[in-house]
């Protein structure tokens, strides 16, 4: 039983039968995805990346992570790593994206409708990839655009008549977009330049006895709860000025919307499969409703758990798919994405770990190639069935279950223990929904976050960059993580969900 009671302890999402409910609008967009061509890798991958990297308008934080600076002995493998990159979303997020596009086409203002009305699903994902800033951080939204323009604040007006250049919807993401972008990951194989410690600054480590030379890298984005009335704060924190009927809160799950605000809240109620509340309806009970750092707010532990569940499913299913392709067991390095400066409640770390354990058990026999999950830099050392060295037992698993470690480790430290030899290292890192991989890296702030230190220790600054790895890190290469179907390219997923060409629109 969860620390937070039976309601929070419910298993969600379901493993089967949870494919998105499609309106006529969404069905048409998903049907169109069946024609999307998955890009094919070739010998020219490397040359294209090197050429486009040289043309990229911003200076890199360090050059040691560029493909052209890698050892010639690594280049054949890097050519394959370039082609291994793709954007990834959970299948519930796919349904949300389709509903969001329909919402903007119906309820959007004069600024929004011209942007969204002609977008395909893959076109929308491409927008989320290429319209983001290079850097975007701090409470005042300090930013650096790919164009080189920089400043702070102004994003709340994007997509309204009050927007001002350069922060206009045609060129950048609105806060509504960023909230959806936070549910998008990019994954690839990569070389590791060093162990990835926070202060690595791109130094080249040639010691193969301490460094895992290559593995998988996945950018994961936590809930940004540090900005009131924006992002996931809208769903997870119940606040007096935010949670009002006028803003669309408090409606039943199936209640039809009659205003733009009501329809926007409908999207998120359906995504999280729970109603939202008006401030005053929720009383702190340390079960579903917990305290928040702001004593006037109430923290919804259930919705926080569901936000985590979507991310954890993605990471676990992606690690499984990557490991299965190479016939290995995955060693997953997990960091507490969203548990730093974005955190709004002390109980979040415990919710994080309880949810991760439940998703491992729930996905269970779909994770036969996941061998170990290593929680790194967590303050909690015991949580439910999770402790250093514990085994999450899974009937039929080739290793009887998934081993758990909880200790501090550098992301790319050598898997030197005999029982870990031959495993595939899958590293998660805390990314941002409105920044290129590395974020502060592009402002030469190399030691500020795990995001920038990851860009200094892997090839993500090029491989996960939609301006540089244009063929593979793009919306047309979208992959869907489905608990029922595994990880599939969007075209294959669409064909499975929409069974035949003759299905009615």
UniProtKB/Swiss-Prot annotation:
Keywords: Hydrolase
Enzyme Commission designation: 3.2.2.19
Entry keyword Transmembrane: no
Residues the record lists as binding ADP-D-ribose: 198, 336, 338, 340-342, 377, 432, 439-440, 450-451
GO molecular function, one term: ADP-ribosylarginine hydrolase activity
Catalytic reaction annotation: N(omega)-(ADP-D-ribosyl)-L-arginyl-[protein] + H2O = ADP-D-ribose + L-arginyl-[protein]; N(omega)-(ADP-D-ribosyl)-L-arginine + H2O = ADP-D-ribose + L-arginine
InterPro entries: MavL-like
Superkingdom of the source species: Eukaryota
Function: Protein ADP-ribosyl hydrolase that specifically removes mono-ADP-ribosyl modifications from protein arginine residues.
Stated name of the protein: ADP-ribosylarginine hydrolase CG2909
Organism: Drosophila melanogaster (Fruit fly)
């Amino acid at each position: 039983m969860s620390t937070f009671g039976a309601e929070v302890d419910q298993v969600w999402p379901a493993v089967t039968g949870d494919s998105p409910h499609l309106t006529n609008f969404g069905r048409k967009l998903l049907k169109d995805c069946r024609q999307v061509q998955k890009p094919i890798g070739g010998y020219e991958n490397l040359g294209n990346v090197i050429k486009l990297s040289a043309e990229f308008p911003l200076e890199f934080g360090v050059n040691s992570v560029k493909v052209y600076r890698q050892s010639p002995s690594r280049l054949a493998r890097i050519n394959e790593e370039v082609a291994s990159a793709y954007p990834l979303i959970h299948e519930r997020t796919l349904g949300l994206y389709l509903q969001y596009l329909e919402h903007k086409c119906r309820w959007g203002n004069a600024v929004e409708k011209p942007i969204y009305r002609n977008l395909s699903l893959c076109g929308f994902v491409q927008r989320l990839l290429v319209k983001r800033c290079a850097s975007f951080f701090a409470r005042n939204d300090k930013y650096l655009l790919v164009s080189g323009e920089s400043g702070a604040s102004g994003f709340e007006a994007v997509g309204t008549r009050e927007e001002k250049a350069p922060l206009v919807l045609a060129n950048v993401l609105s806060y509504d977009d960023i909230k959806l972008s936070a549910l998008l990951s990019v994954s690839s194989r990569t070389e590791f330049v060093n162990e990835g410690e926070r202060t690595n600054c791109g130094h080249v480590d040639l010691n193969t006895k301490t460094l895992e030379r290559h593995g998988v890298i996945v950018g994961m984005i936590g809930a940004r709860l540090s900005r009131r009335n924006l992002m996931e704060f809208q769903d997870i924190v119940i606040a007096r000025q935010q949670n009002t009927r006028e803003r669309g809160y408090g409606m039943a799950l199936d209640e039809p919307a009659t205003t733009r605000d009501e329809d926007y809240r409908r999207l998120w109620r359906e995504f999280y499969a729970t109603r939202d509340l008006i401030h005053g309806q929720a009383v702190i009970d340390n079960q579903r409703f917990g305290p928040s750092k702001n004593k006037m707010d109430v923290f919804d532990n259930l919705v926080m758990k569901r936000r985590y569940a979507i991310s954890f499913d993605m990471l676990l299913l992606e690690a499984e798919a990557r490991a299965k392709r190479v016939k290995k067991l995955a060693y997953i390095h997990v960091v507490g994405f969203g548990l730093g400066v974005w955190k709004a409640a002390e109980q979040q770390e415990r919710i994080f770990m309880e949810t991760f354990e439940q998703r491992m058990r729930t996905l269970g026999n779909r994770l036969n190639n996941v061998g170990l999950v290593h929680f790194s830099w967590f303050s909690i050392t015991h949580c439910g069935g999770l402790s250093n060295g514990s085994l999450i037992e899974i009937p039929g698993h080739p290793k009887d279950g998934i081993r758990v470690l909880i200790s501090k480790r550098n992301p790319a430290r050598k898997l030197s223990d005999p029982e870990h030899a031959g495993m595939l290292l899958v590293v998660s890192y805390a990314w941002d929904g409105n920044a290129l991989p590395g974020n502060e890296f592009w402002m030469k702030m190399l030691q500020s976050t795990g995001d920038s230190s990851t860009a200094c220790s892997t090839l993500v600054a090029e491989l996960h960059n939609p301006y540089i790895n244009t063929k593979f890190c793009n919306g047309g290469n979208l992959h869907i993580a489905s608990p029922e179907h595994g990880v599939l390219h969007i075209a294959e997923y669409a064909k499975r969900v929409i069974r035949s060409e003759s299905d009615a629109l």
